[in-house]
Amino acid sequence: MKRNIGLLSLIMMFWFVISFITNILGPLIPDIISGFSLTNLAMAGFIPTFFFIAYAIMSIPAGILIDRFGEKPVLFCGFLMPFIGTILFACMPTYPMLLASCFIIGLGMAMLQTVLNPLQRAVGGEENYAFVAELAQFMFGIASFISPLVYTYLIKKLDPVTYEAGKNIFIDS
C-alpha cells in the first residue's frame, strides 16, 4: 500500500471535493429563496431534488462508460460536468437554469462516485478496503462540515455590503 499513498491521497481529495460541492446546497437554499423571491417553498425543494435525481439517473450509465472508455475519461467528465453546470448558471442566473445546473452538477458527482468506489478498492488493496472506505467517508464528513463554514465566510466577510443578517439560519448560527 505504501507505493499507492499518493494516489490514495488524491482519491481522498476527490471525496472531499464531492462532499464539499454536495453539502453546500443546504446553506444556499435560504439565499436562493430570497434571491429568486420564491414564495412557494416547494420550488426550493426542487433544487436538491434535481441534484439527487441526477445521481439516480447517471450511476448505471457511468458504470457503462467506465467499462467502455476507462476511469480517466469518466473522471475527467465527472469534474467537467460541475464546471459546465456552474458556468451555465453564471451566464444565465434564472431559476430554470439553476435547476438545470443542479442536475448537470449532480450528473458529474454521480460519475465521480462511480469511478472512485472501485478505484479506492484497487489502490488501497482488497485487504485494506474497509479502512480505505472509512477514510473516504471521514473525508466526506470533514468536507460536509467545512463547506457551510466556507460559504459563511464568503458571504459574511468578503461581501458585507450585500449580507443581510437574519436571512439564513446556517450563516447566522
In which residue ranges do the predicted regions lie?
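Extracytoplasmic
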Residues: G6-L38, N117, S147, Y151
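Central cavity-lining transmembrane alpha-helices of secondary-active solute carriers
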Residues: F46-I64
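Helix-breaking motifs and short loop linkers at transmembrane-helix boundaries and internal kinks
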Residues: G70, C91-P96
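C-terminal ends and interior cores of transmembrane alpha-helices
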Residues: L80-P93
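Intracellular juxtamembrane helix-capping segments at the cytosolic ends
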Residues: M111-G125
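Glycine-rich segments within core transmembrane alpha-helices of 12-TM secondary carriers
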Residues: A130-I155
